[in-house]
């Protein structure tokens, strides 16, 4: 298994990359071509679908960034991490946990859950 801390860092780097060409390159370097992303409000299949989900979040929250909350952990082909989404230096009003399934060193499936949403 690849190091959970490294996978979590690279995963959140993708979500925070605003340059679309750089973001697509990061996605291609981390995700499997037939990967899938699911959370309660978004779904993306394949590299283009995942990029579209990320771009949608960035457009909806242009001044927010993802940051890891606590340590990532994992076993076998699975990684779990918690994250916050908010302005730099401020409290994260949106918090969640993502479960990542890997095939080799690439993300195959990500399932996200929201732990906290603004009222």
How should each PLM-predicted stretch be described?
Residues 1-119:
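C-terminal and inter-domain tail/linker signature
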């Amino acid at each position: 298994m690849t190091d959970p801390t490294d996978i979590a860092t690279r995963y959140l780097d993708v979500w925070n990359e605003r340059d679309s060409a750089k973001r697509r390159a990061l996605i291609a370097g981390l995700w499997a071509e037939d990967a899938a992303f699911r959370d309660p409000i978004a779904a993306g299949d394949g590299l283009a679908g995942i990029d579209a989900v990320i771009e949608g979040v960035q457009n909806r929250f242009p001044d927010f960034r993802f940051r890891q909350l606590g340590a990532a952990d994992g076993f076998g082909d699975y990684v779990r991490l918690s994250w916050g989404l908010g302005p730099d230096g401020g409290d994260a009003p949106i918090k969640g946990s993502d479960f990542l399934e890997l095939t080799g060193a690439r993300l195959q499936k990500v399932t996200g859950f929201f732990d906290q949403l603004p009222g």
